[in-house]
UniProtKB/Swiss-Prot annotation:
The modification N-acetylproline is found at residue 3. This is Ribulose bisphosphate carboxylase large chain. Its cofactor is Mg(2+). Pfam families: RuBisCO_large, RuBisCO_large_N. The record marks 334 as: Transition state stabilizer. The modification N6,N6,N6-trimethyllysine is found at residue 14. RuBisCO catalyzes two reactions: the carboxylation of D-ribulose 1,5-bisphosphate, the primary event in carbon dioxide fixation, as well as the oxidative fragmentation of the pentose substrate in the photorespiration process. Both reactions occur simultaneously and in competition at the same active site. It comes from Pleurastrum terricola. The keyword Transmembrane does not apply. The lineage of its organism: Eukaryota, Viridiplantae, Chlorophyta, core chlorophytes, Chlorophyceae. Belongs to the RuBisCO large chain family. Type I subfamily.
Amino acid sequence: MAPQTETKAGAGFKAGVKDYRLTYYTPEYQVKETDILAAFRMTPQPGVPPEEAGAAVAAESSTGTWTTVWTDGLTSLDRYKGRCYDIEPVAGEENQFIAYVAYPLDLFEEGSVTNLFTSIVGNVFGFKALRALRLEDLRIPPAYVKTFQGPPHGIQVERDKLNKYGRSLLGCTIKPKLGLSAKNYGRAVYECLRGGLDFTKDDENVNSQAFMRWRDRFLFVAEALYKSQAETGEIKGHYLNATAGTCEEMLKRAECAKELGVPIIMHDYLTGGFTANTTLAHYCRDHGLLLHIHRAMHAVIDRQRNHGMHFRVLAKALRLSGGDHLHSGTVVGKLEGEREVTLGFVDLMRDDYIEKDRSRGIYFTQDWVSLPGTMPVASGGIHVWHMPALVEIFGDDACLQFGGGTLGHPWGNAPGAAANRVALEACVQARNEGRDLAREGGDVIRAACKWSPELAAACEVWKEIKFEFDTIDTL
């Protein structure tokens, strides 16, 4: 490091660059109940000691800068600084370490995920002393959780609104995702819902393009909802995507959905931004709308093992910002998801208290202090043969979304929906009777085919479909 030089301004200030670890590496520190705790996977540059790298992370994500400044003397840095209080090597990885950093609560604005992330996952990720940096987990203390509204309604209120109990919910993304006219889109929605699904969904790319303006889509979808409800006697929903180029336009679309009387709308929370998402979540609670959240762009942030941010952090942030549903991967479909890690962040989304469990990727005990839960949505390359595994893995409090697994049925959308509904109810009945779905799931589906020609046709179409690739994110 460069030598320190004393200025003429006064003997109390010495200009120059000093080692971060002299101030920000504090292994003797006892964490407080009010601290926000972070677990960073860091890969230091060659020659940089892990203690210096961990201290640099704590400094650059809190009060530090690259040099000593005289204004440090105008405040209590000891009160506001982040502290790297522990470092451990990553088993099986060369030159990778987990750095644990504690942040005092006063560093963050109440009720703002935007401010929280600006500090903790801000400029520090471009710091030259580090080859790579990944935020693996955050502990949000109850004192900070209580400053957030969280999901507009939560799992139990959603079930009460929809009058649906004792099973997973079923959904479907309308395909092709782009290019349909509003009228044909509404027809596809109607066919899926009358066939037995609970929800249909706008694709995340569907906003208000020239081939289908948002208001036209909203009107035809609302007509499909009411018609299918009248025919089936069940409450139906469609995730109308309110994501827009401005918050004002987003709220205008949400207002239209409310006036049409639909039960649920949708937002792309990463591309739309946390400020917009929190704004929409508050609107949804005030006006009785459920809020479905899509995670488009997440893999840009979370897919690399050594740099970025794990999805469990994005899931925690969404629960704070607000969303009743969140896409979470499937474990069994085409999109990535390792079982124990996926179930770890699924529990973080919907349970009230989660114990630390490193085998599931949970670095800290998390107490949500009765913040409403977010329902996980399993989607991506799933079909009727996956139903036993999905019911066994996710349980009842999940939404299972079959896009191609509904619309790809050889007889059409309604038979595809019926096949999924029959498969789900057969699996739920078998589970309730004490059967082991992990071992007997195939037999359960084959037995149900005998009294459901729609399911039999679906099973024949997808009997050979598998997505077998190694997962990237393993513990």
